[in-house]
Amino acid sequence: MVHFTPEEKCIISKQWGQVNIDETGGEALGRLLVVYPWTQRFFDNFGNLSSSSAIMGNPKVKAHGKKVLTSFGDAIKNMDNLKGAFAKLSELHCDKLHVDPENFKLLGNVLLIVLATHFGKEFTPEVQAAWQKLVSGVAIALAHKYH
């Protein structure tokens, strides 16, 4: 279980209020699909994923990216109980979708890159450490059903 300090919670909550969910979610998922092309197999109903520009401009990628990033909002509201907050999503990804749990870590790392790009100098090492702890905690929570 991941434990957050009050300072880490404050850092994440403050910065989360500045995140454009639509833009950041679509970019993070799009980058995941481009950088790790084997993840595309989970999105075969998304249409054209044949190139980087096709992926980044794909409305289904953007919509699902928004949905994924919205779930990070739930994580921020439930930082003290990530496992409980993601129990149903863990079950869905394990039992129905059969997603390799390593992909959750990959998405978290891609999200950190996107946040760093968007926030620039505001994304200090302290901020990165707090976000890294959150995305790692979410990945662990999503992988919980696999154990």
UniProtKB/Swiss-Prot annotation:
GO terms for cellular component: blood microparticle; haptoglobin-hemoglobin complex; hemoglobin complex. The modification Phosphoserine is found at residue 51. GO terms for biological process: hydrogen peroxide catabolic process. Heme b binds at residues 64, 93. SUPFAM superfamilies: Globin-like. It comes from the Eukaryota. InterPro entries: Globin, Globin-like_sf, Globin/Proto, Hemoglobin_b, Hemoglobin_oxygen_transport. Keywords: Heme, Iron, Metal-binding, Oxygen transport, Phosphoprotein, Transport. Hemoglobin epsilon chain is a beta-type chain found in early embryos. This is Hemoglobin subunit epsilon. It comes from Oryctolagus cuniculus. The lineage of its organism: Eukaryota, Metazoa, Chordata, Craniata, Vertebrata.
